[in-house]
Amino acid sequence: MTWGMHTKDTPGKGRVLVVDDEENVRKLVRVSLTKAGYDVEEAENGEEAERIIQAQDNPLMVDVILCDIRMPKVNGIEAITFFQKQYPSVPIVVITGFPDTEMAVNLLKQGVMDYVPKPIDGAKLLDIVSKAMAKRGSLKG
């Protein structure tokens, strides 16, 4: 897949990077978002996500990041910290099977846009991604 920010000359609603160690979750998110018109890239963990992003020619090739918290290798907290430092204008939405209110509040205070517990509600996911895309659009200038 070729990455690059969407413009009025490129098709689709935007590009989403899904970072989750559970293949079934990545598939569910990919299918839901693809049907809604988004381009989706997947990573199994934070380490792979960092590699994907750093390998791209354009450092702002992704519009929204959906990231699990508990993953092997580089976990979600570490990945989120990396994303926020390197790409502060890219909205991050946390997805996790361990809903912890205190953790969610702390992540929101640290600049994460939203928090979606698993199992993921497809309609809620689309609503949150749409809001994140709108936020991303306002941050692009």
What are these regions (language model features)?
Residues 27-35:
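Charged docking surfaces used in two-component/phosphorelay signaling
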Residues 44-48, 75-78:
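Acidic catalytic/metal-coordinating carboxylates
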Residues 1-17, 58, 123-126, 130-141:
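Non-catalytic signal-transmission and effector/linker regions of two-component phosphorelay proteins
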Residues 57-66:
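Active-site beta3 strand of CheY-like receiver
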Residues 51, 77-89, 106:
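Short amphipathic alpha-helix used as the core "switch/output" element in two-component signaling
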Residues 71:
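Receiver (REC) domain active-site loop signature in two-component systems and cognate sites
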